[in-house]
Structures are given as C-alpha cells and as structure tokens.
C-alpha cells in the first residue's frame, strides 16, 4: 500500500534584512568567524543543501573575474553546475587562499575544528549559534525557527521574487521535479499577501460611507 504523503509544515525563510544581519554577526577577524561568514554567504549565493556544502572541494570551483562556476554534488550522486556572483565568489576565493589550499584540489573547502571535512551537524551548530545570537540582539527580527535549509528556502524565494523563471530556479537548486520548486512560489505568494494586507490596513479607504 503506497504511503500517503504528509503535508510539510510551513517553511521558514529569512527576509533580506535578516540575511544582511546574519552576515554581520560572525567576527571575521578570527578563523572561526571568517569560516562561518564565508559559509553563510556561500549558502545564500548558491542555495546549496548542507550536505552539498560539506562535500564541496577546491577542485569543484573555477574562479573567473566576475563570478565562480561550481560543480555541486547533489542527491543521487548527480552533479549540477551553478554560478555564484562576484561578491560571493571573491569572498570564497579569499577564504580558500587564506587557508592556503587554493592548489590542493582534493581538499574540502569547509572544515571543522576537529575534522578536515565539515559535517551537517557542524553546520547546524553554526546556524543555531548565530540565530540564537540574532534573536537576542534583534528581538524584533528572527521570529521563527530556522535550520540550514532555511537559507536554501530563502535563496529560492528571493530568486522567484526577483523574477527568475521557475525552471531556472529548479535547475539551480537541483530539484528533480518542478513541483518541488513550486513550494517556494507559495512562500512568495504568502509574502505578497502580507504586503497587500499591510497596504489595505494602512492606505485603503476607511470611510465605509463611500460604499453605501
């Protein structure tokens, strides 16, 4: 008997202001802070899953003057080619150069304090650390529960809101089905509904006599 699909709960994503705030929290003057800031920015620019970030090696990346081309090793051993913009590319390159592994193609880009290859659990701890910090410092923001996958949701949502075609977002994220990507259009619609409600509450005619 085929199992019934359980509807997924609402997916939390970050607003643009929350993304900017999150990027500012790591102290990039030390090794851990520099790693964490680079990781957060890379995940937003690439929309990658946590495991895909763990698997990323120096040899997967080709740097160009205005961008980087990256081979992402996704689910089912499928590899997809994506590009990230100049700012994210420069940050990633500087981090790799800082680690002195730019010519070591087999090295993993992100490592933990104890292992050469970072784990998903380590990425989860990084997000938990900075989201907890953000909730304390900015109580009016970060009102929901977040995971590393929230950044992937955020990338998809912001791409769609910027007018990027659904099929392009699908390929960028490595979704097998377009139906999976359409989940994010619902988030975008929800964002639009909130904006419309705000407009109605603040600006629409309040005098009901106009309609009598």
Regions found by a protein language model. Name each.
Residues 1-212:
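Conserved catalytic core of the tyrosine transesterase superfamily
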């Amino acid at each position: 008997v085929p199992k019934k699909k359980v509807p997924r709960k609402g997916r939390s994503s970050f607003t643009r202001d929350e993304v900017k705030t999150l990027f500012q929290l790591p102290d990039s003057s030390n090794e851990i802070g520099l790693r964490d800031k680079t990781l957060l920015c890379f995940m937003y620019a690439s929309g990658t899953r946590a495991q895909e970030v763990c698997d990323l090696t120096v040899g997967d990346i080709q740097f160009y003057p205005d961008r980087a081309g990256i081979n992402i090793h996704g689910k089912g051993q499928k590899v997809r080619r994506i590009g990230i913009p100049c700012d994210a590319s420069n940050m990633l390159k500087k981090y790799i150069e800082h680690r002195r592994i730019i010519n070591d193609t087999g090295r993993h880009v992100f490592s933990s304090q104890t292992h050469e290859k970072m784990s998903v659990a380590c990425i989860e701890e990084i997000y938990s650390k900075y989201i907890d910090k953000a909730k304390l410092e900015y109580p009016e923001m970060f009102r929901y529960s977040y995971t590393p996958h929230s950044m992937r949701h955020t990338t998809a949502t912001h791409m769609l809101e910027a007018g990027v075609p659904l099929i392009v977002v699908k390929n960028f994220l490595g979704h097998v089905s377009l139906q999976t990507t359409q989940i994010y259009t619902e988030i975008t619609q929800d964002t639009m509904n909130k904006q419309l409600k705000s407009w109605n509450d603040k600006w629409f005619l309040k005098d009901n006599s106009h309609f009598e």
